[in-house]
Amino acid sequence: MDAEDLSSARRALAAAARRSGDVLGALPAPGGRSPEQRATAAAAKDTARALRCRFMDVHAEAVYDELTDGRTRHLRLAELAEAAAGAFPGLVPTADQLAAERLRPQAGKEGHEIDQGIFFSRVLRAPVAGPHLLASMLRPTPRALRLLPEFLRTGSADLGSVRLQRTGGVARLTMCRDDCLNAEDDRQVDDMETAVDLALLDPAVRVGLLRGGEMTHPRYRGRRVFSAGINLKALHVGGISLVDFLLRRELGYIHKLLRGVLAADHACWHSPAIEKPWVAVVDGFAIGGGAQLLLVFDQVLAAADAYLSLPAADEGIIPGAANFRLTRRAGPRLSRQVILTGRRIQASEPDARLLVDQIAESEELDAVTERCLARLQSPAVVANRRMQIFAEETPEEFLRYMAEFSLQQALRLYSDDVVAKAGRFHAKKQAARNPDGG
């Protein structure tokens, strides 16, 4: 495909986007449209999106090469989307469009992030661009690099929703969103990736530990909780983004937990990534995204009264890469029960042993954790975990999954049932906070 063909296709794409924008601009805001107006808007967007798909099916590699200067620049997801908005008008939403969307509740948005889903689905499935983007997302974040010298000096970092402490060769990451039971939003994803980067980049760290902190919620006051999953309140008010939460979470810190970090100054001919073993300790519960996390840890410990669940069918969204990994860990039957029917797995039941390595009473869990951390500091652990991961999950398989996930999750994010469920959750929380309607 020559430059003239790409230039012609670029002009056609921009023209189609303008036509779609003209139709939408003549209508009321999304929340105030009649059924007929919603149908008109949907038809205009569908026409433009079909052209975006065809454009990226043909030109994904050329587009990516232009945006990254022939793959000499390592752009992260948000940077790549921003560059695409400027270089290829109409391909993805502009910064102004996204800023306007962020001011609206989920039910009142136009759904421009679906166009980002189209873009990333095609980039990730491209044979050359996909692996390059995957590697770019394994590089340390600029925030982590800024904080690294101080962390190396003090062994401590308070990132807001995550606290990081280095003691005895262990990087201890504590999730401390006590206001929402460690439910994740864009902010926590950024904090988590920064913490994971710091732990991996510190040569004094030999193993990482992730655990939830003590809560202030009346029901769990003074007790540790691992994670309540996605923050549904943030979803309702439009605070969960496709790129900075749903895609960055999977391609960023979760993938780094599995494969390590690619540091530019890590000159090692036999291992370009800095990899370390990881332990997760589940107190209370690991719901949704919390349960997804466990699938990439080398050892999972849990309190005897803890439970795991992936209520994807109830929430209406796709549970990250759990559809990809859970079947490999627990088999197709249990995977379908957990994801499709919302089955809750108690740590004490036999099926939990497919997901949890060791169960302990709450008062014994600290001691069990320390023994596990000591075992994983053996010099041979890193090489053996690398070979196990190589056998269990190839980057090519993960890319294929994430390419499809990018689009399907974007569609789910703006589906009527997800918007309605998030709204009901928010209303329930508001009613509980103001029982007299005040």
Task: Provide a role label for each language-model segment.
Residues 267-379:
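Crotonase-fold acyl-CoA enzyme core
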Residues 173-174, 191-260, 266-274, 279, ...:
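A structural preference for short, pocket-lining loop segments at secondary-structure junctions
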Residues 173, 192, 210, 293-294, ...:
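Hydrophobic alpha-helical segments that mediate membrane insertion or helix-helix packing
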Residues 180-184, 396:
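A generic structural signal for short coil/turn motifs at secondary-structure boundaries
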Residues 169-177:
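Short, aliphatic-rich beta-strand segments
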Residues 1-168, 346, 375-438:
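C-terminal alpha-helix plus adjacent terminal tail
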